[in-house]
């Protein structure tokens, strides 16, 4: 009997428990809220908001405000100084370093011991449980898994608090038994210089029997490409003949899918999306034929959703399919009614399944067009399909007024395979955006409000060079896809040596 068959039996009880997500979503979420309130009622935050008097969701909403990072920052800073019982019981030792706010370069998201085990690691375990349920012939544990971690090794900060990328924190605290089926070595995984780490990982992993890989698609592709160059091979299965699954998250997979399918031609290869962030682990793609993800309802996360078209937050049982919501979470790491910054759309409410539609700050609405990241991904996928092009990285922002008084969207795109006709690619992208976004279509009518979009071709490695200059190469760092501001795109254009306008 294979090792996977033996280990797989451990996941059977959880596979059965996940069936509760089909029709007990509200009950699961109410139980999570009750646990969070009871656990934190004697903390400073719990006393200040009278947690002991909260009897249900309505009381919770009436007594606890919706918070941004800035509003919790003072408490988090005190926790980092070593104070206890502030937002969550006891002392919180670990803090996940995340991209910053308007006022700060970085955010420091508390990661409690309970949150580490019952949110972050629970998500990893459930990803495997669901994969094994869907693929009973899997042999993933008969080999090793390549886990691509973040670019900041955990380091001692204030009062012995520890700070690092979430992925680095997970590697630091992982069960030692997992190291028996994982590559690379911990020292390599936690290297801060991504360019050095990429080569070390390739060297350590190329002669191993790797069956599964986990990480951010863009950075994993860089590692795999490096390994192909070292080995002189064309396809990944020539190096790892038993590779079978890629657990990916952090950025949308659509722009990278074609490149992975060219790199890995094995018919046994599977791709499974997860939604994990510094703040928690929220969703898993439970059906390989459906790009939407199952919302994980029985971790230490209570969800609320703010309609992007206006209105008060609603609990899970108040959401509607097809609407765009900003996600709000309360967690066993001490985040209370915290705006995470992501937007989602539900595709089903039985079970609760969703897609990530974008970021609350990553959109273009300069002229009332309300373009979101999901629109952009669909538009690019269509243009690539029609032209045979492949997009590696991109960003877009508005041009508010040029010398001819014309407003438009400006796209900066790095292609791994350039379209033969860039004008046609731009036309197809513009056409598809109008088909899927009625607001964009209305603003494009007769070019009155919004002119035809402009595409500028980025030179090779432009986006990586930009991230490197900002000290954000590798790990969970990502390129902002859409922005109402020109701050990012202007910085990128100044670095760009190729001006291939449409």
Task: Annotate the PLM regions.
Residues 95-104, 277-279, 346:
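Ser/Thr-glycine-rich phosphate-binding loops at phosphate-binding pockets of nucleotides
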Residues 105, 115-119, 263-270:
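Short, charged helix-to-loop "capping" segments that act as catalytic/coupling loops
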Residues 1-52, 60-67, 75-82, 167-502:
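Active-site glycine/GP-rich loop and adjacent strand/helix microenvironment
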Residues 104-109, 363-366:
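Short small-residue beta-strand/loop micro-motif enriched in glycine and branched aliphatics
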Residues 121-124, 129-145, 180-184, 200:
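Extended alpha-helical, oligomerization-prone segments that build pores/tubes and scaffolds
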């Amino acid at each position: 009997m294979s090792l996977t068959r033996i280990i797989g039996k451990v996941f059977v009880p959880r596979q059965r428990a996940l069936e509760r997500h089909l029709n007990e979503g509200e009950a699961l979420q109410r139980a999570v809220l009750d646990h969070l309130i009871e656990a934190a009622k004697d903390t400073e935050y719990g006393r200040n908001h009278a947690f002991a008097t909260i009897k249900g969701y309505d009381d919770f909403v009436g007594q606890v405000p919706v918070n941004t990072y800035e509003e919790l920052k003072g408490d988090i800073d005190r926790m980092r100084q070593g104070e206890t019982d502030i937002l969550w019981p006891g002392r919180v030792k670990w803090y996940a370093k995340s991209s910053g706010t308007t006022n700060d370069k970085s955010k420091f998201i508390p990661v409690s011991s309970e949150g580490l085990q019952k949110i972050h690691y629970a998500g990893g375990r459930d990803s495997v449980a669901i994969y094994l349920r869907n693929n009973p012939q899997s042999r993933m544990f008969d080999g090793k898994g390549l886990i691509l971690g973040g670019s900041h090794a955990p380091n001692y900060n204030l009062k012995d608090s520890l700070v690092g990328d979430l992925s680095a924190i997970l590697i630091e605290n992982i069960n030692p038994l997992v190291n028996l089926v994982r590559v690379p070595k911990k020292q390599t995984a936690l290297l801060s210089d991504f360019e050095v780490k990429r080569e070390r990982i390739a060297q350590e992993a190329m002669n191993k029997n790797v069956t599964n890989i986990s990480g951010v698609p863009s950075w994993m592709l860089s590692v795999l490409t490096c390994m192909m160059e070292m080995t002189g091979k064309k396809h990944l299965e020539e190096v790892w003949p038993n590779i079978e699954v890629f657990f990916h998250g952090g950025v949308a997979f659509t722009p990278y899918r074609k490149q992975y399918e060219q790199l890995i031609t094995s018919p046994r290869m599977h791709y499974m999306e997860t939604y994990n962030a510094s703040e928690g682990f929220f969703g898993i793609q439970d059906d390989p034929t459906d790009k939407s993800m199952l919302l994980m309802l029985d971790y230490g996360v209570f969800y609320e959703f703010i309609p992007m078209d206006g209105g008060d937050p609603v609990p899970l049982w108040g959401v509607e399919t097809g609407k765009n919501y900003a996600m709000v979470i309360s967690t066993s790491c001490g985040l209370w009614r915290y705006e995470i910054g992501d937007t989602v759309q539900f595709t089903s409410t039985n079970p609760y399944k969703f897609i990530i539609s974008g970021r609350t700050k990553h959109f273009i609405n300069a002229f009332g067009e309300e373009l979101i990241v999901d629109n952009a991904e669909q538009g690019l996928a269509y243009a690539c399909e029609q032209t045979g092009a492949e997009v590696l990285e991109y960003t877009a922002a508005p041009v508010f007024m040029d010398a001819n008084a014309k407003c438009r969207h400006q796209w900066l795109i790095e292609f791994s395979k350039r379209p033969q006709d860039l004008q046609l690619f731009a036309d197809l992208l513009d056409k598809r955006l109008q088909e899927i976004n009625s607001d964009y279509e209305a603003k494009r009518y007769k070019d009155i409000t919004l002119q035809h979009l402009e595409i500028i071709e980025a030179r090779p490695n432009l986006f990586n060079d930009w991230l490197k200059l900002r000290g954000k190469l590798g790990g969970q760092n990502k390129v902002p896809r859409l922005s109402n501001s020109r701050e990012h795109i202007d910085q990128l254009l100044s670095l760009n040596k190729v001006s291939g306008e449409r």
